Swiss-Prot record:
Listed GO biological process terms: carbohydrate metabolic process
Name of the protein in its database record: Glucan endo-1,3-beta-glucosidase
Species for this entry: Glycine max
Sequence similarity: Belongs to the glycosyl hydrolase 17 family.
Listed GO MF terms: glucan endo-1,3-beta-D-glucosidase activity
PROSITE patterns from the UniProt entry: GLYCOSYL_HYDROL_F17 (PS00587)
Keyword Hydrolase carried by entry: yes
The reaction(s) this protein catalyses: Hydrolysis of (1->3)-beta-D-glucosidic linkages in (1->3)-beta-D-glucans
Pfam families assigned: Glyco_hydro_17
Keyword Isomerase attributed: no
Keywords assigned by UniProt, alphabetized: Glycosidase, Hydrolase
Length: 255
């Protein structure tokens, strides 16, 4: 399979991209020269931008301008933004997931943009962080090695986290919006449960699960388009994760 990439827009660039000419220049500089050789699947305008930060106000305008520049060049790249699980509250059971009161007014116009452009919402889903923050969560549940379902019908933490985001989308009337998992990973050292063995188990099982077509309880029978994060999760440890994950790139694991 050809490698497909998610291209991130640097956080410090977001404000300038609210100017349409700057967005056109950005596409001309970073996308157009490489478009024949690189398969850009998505452009992520902002990665884990929180609603109460200064740059949040620039996201939708920057997305719109980048999309217009992309469309004018007849590229088929989809423009989105990547959220993380901190924008979701009441995430267990997953069916109760909703956007936080801060996140809802931020995300709703973005959702409308995505729906109108046929683009998915990008979401970074890290069972590791949930496990590290609450070690009453069984490690096997986080690593896809638990046998049988838990009391709300879930066999693994990844599905539960993903479905809580789907529930939040349903709650704001966006039940048809697809989620693409733009990052997922497990560290090989540096924290509770972080080891080469656990990382290897997580990646192997995630790849198997995402490509199986089983889907999640809320979205059964679908492959889960998922990209692996290619660096250690700890920002001060830059070693490459095990498996053949290319440093600093997200690699697709679904066709």
């Amino acid at each position: 399979h050809e490698i497909e990439l998610i291209m991130d827009v640097a956080k410090e660039t977001l404000q300038s991209l609210t100017d349409s000419n700057a967005a056109t220049d950005w596409v001309n500089k970073y996308v157009t020269p490489y478009s024949q050789d690189v398969n850009f699947k998505y452009i992520a305008v902002g990665n884990e931008i929180h609603p109460n930060t200064n740059v949040a106000q620039y996201i939708l305008s920057a997305m719109t301008n980048i999309q217009n520049a992309i469309s004018s060049r007849k590229f088929t790249i989809k423009v989105s933004t990547a959220i993380d699980s901190t924008l979701i509250t009441n995430s267990y059971p997953p069916n109760d997931g909703v956007f936080t009161s801060d996140a809802e007014p931020y995300i709703k116009p973005i959702i409308n943009f995505l729906v109108s452009n046929g683009a998915p919402l990008l979401a970074n889903v890290y069972p590791y962080f949930a496990y590290a923050n609450d070690q009453s969560i069984p490690l096997a549940y986080a690593l896809f090695t638990q046998q049988g379902n838990n009391d709300v019908g879930y066999q693994n933490l990844f599905d539960a986290m993903l479905d809580s985001i789907y529930a939040a989308l349903e709650n704001v009337g966006a039940s048809n919006l697809q989620i693409v998992v733009s990052e997922s990973g497990w560290p090989s050292e540096g924290g509770a449960g972080a080891s080469i063995d656990n990382a290897g188990t997580y990646y192997a099982n995630l790849i198997r699960h995402a490509s199986s077509g089983d889907g999640t309880p809320k979205r059964p029978g679908e492959s889960i388009e998922t990209y692996l994060f290619g660096r250690c999760l700890s920002e001060n440890q830059k070693q490459v994760l095990i498996l053949s994950v290319i440093f600093g790139l997200s690699l697709p694991i679904s066709s």
